[in-house]
Amino acid sequence: MSRIAATFARLRDEGRAGLIPFVEAFDPDRETSATLLAGMAARGADLIEIGMPFTDPMADGPTIQQAGRRALRAGATLAGTLGLVRDFRAVNDTVPLILMGYLNPILSYGVERFTADAAAAGVDGVIVVDLPTEEADLLLPHLRQHRIDLIRLVAPTTTDERLPVVLNDSSGFVYYVSITGITGTRTASAEDLARDIPRVRKATDMPIAVGFGVRTPAQAATVARFADAAVVASALIDKLAAGLDADGKAPPAIVEAVLDDVAALAAAVRGERRAA
């Protein structure tokens, strides 16, 4: 059983949803992102998303765009991101890691090389935001060969007819984009989730994680009532960015504040029981 499957099986047994925080690799530097990765796992993250910095992150709002720019200035590369995963795996072999990003860096790195290196490093899944469903074969055979899940995005605008098509080649879990538009701009209501999550469940038996617009413990708790996991990204990056010093470095106090937020989010999702 994969780490992702084992984690969601455990969450089902515990009768609760999980927390998936996001960290941008190398934001604002390698050391800080490595500290955040380890700290998130220690503070209650059930899975962790790692952003692969890219020069043109079209689906991301200003927060993650700026994080990517900071990371690239710090020397972020795809090889460096895989190095972060490898270092994390040396001390934690249980928390699943999902790389999230765009197709171009993977193609530049080389698809077969990327999937082999990602598997060797300990990557469990990838979310490729701009990979069209009809072009999944660019990656899918290589990902399957190395037992890495291809996690697909679906949205409120994904029709009932389109859902099975998009999810046909997906594995691990479904990432439900709860809003239309770029990341971190607003949030879905309980009414939205109560309407939309059952519609997605009819199309798949995979777990459903909800992201794009989940910022607070209260919002994460709302997601936990309907979905299998809550994804929190922009709020954590905003907290980190607000505390950077004049040299763009992250003082220990702001790293600790971000991890305190992760702990609060984890407590919030643990306090909710899934709606029947």
Swiss-Prot record:
Alphabetical list of SUPFAM superfamilies matching this protein: Ribulose-phoshate binding barrel
Protein name per UniProt: Tryptophan synthase alpha chain
Enzyme Commission number(s) of this protein: 4.2.1.20
PROSITE patterns: TRP_SYNTHASE_ALPHA
Subunit and interaction comment: Tetramer of two alpha and two beta chains.
Disulfide bonds: none
Entry GO CC: cytosol
HAMAP family for the chain: Trp_synth_alpha
